[in-house]
Amino acid sequence: TTASKTAVAAHRGLLSAAEVAEIRAFAATQTRPEQIQSRSHDDTRIVTYLSYERAFRRRLPEIYAKLRGVALAKHVAEGGDASQRFELRVAEHHVVTPGGGLFDPQHVDAGSLVTVDVMLDAAFEGGAFRTLEDGAAVSHADVFRDPGDAVVFLSLKRHHVDRVTAGARRVLVLEFWDGPERGCPHRCERPRGACDVAVHDAVLAGAGDFGAAFFDALDPALVRDAMAALERDE
């Protein structure tokens, strides 16, 4: 694929120690059961959805703007349209403990445009971030190891993470896509229209919450286009 030929952009020390501490402190407050998911049978890879209710952007706006900036720059550098919609699909906090990793060398972040990974802790062993380069798994541990380091890459570039052998590997993962900013408690698969999960949760919560959740889950751009079409038809 085209993405496989693109380089990973490494940003050593993109975030300061204070910014990393802000992210970790914020992540520690995000404890609602619906926004936490184990991605392994033995709980060695736990993901918390920090974008739930759009909290990451609202609570950490300056950090969000910095990370979106490097993501958009990568998008444009690889031929993307700067005027294209480029919104946060998901913000995830990953904690991987010994035995865990992301082992599929063919893994991609399907449906997204650009992914940003930020290292939040250096107190672990193993867990090297790798990408496939001409069929070989290349480690980026030399540039993506210290807290505040970031790697930015096209989401369809194949990547994986070696097994963690000691400590806890803590990483912030942001994915940007050509869709609306999502606030649902998962990695949304719908770039258009209302999120099925958000609407389903609203139904379970009760009719009083349904309307607000439904309209919050809608794609604002599609709503604007529909309203404009109605006005033209009048």
Predicted regions and their residues:
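Non-heme Fe(II)/2-oxoglutarate
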Residues: 1-85, 193, 199
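Double-stranded beta-helix
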Residues: 4-6, 31, 132-134, 174-227
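A subset of signal/propeptide-processing and intrinsically disordered low-complexity segments
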Residues: 38, 102-104, 228
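Short, charged low-complexity intrinsically disordered segments located at boundaries
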Residues: 52-63, 99-108, 202-206
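Catalytic core of non-heme Fe(II) oxygenases with the double-stranded beta-helix
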Residues: 72-197
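Long, low-complexity, Ser/Pro/Thr- and acidic-rich intrinsically disordered regulatory regions
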Residues: 230-234
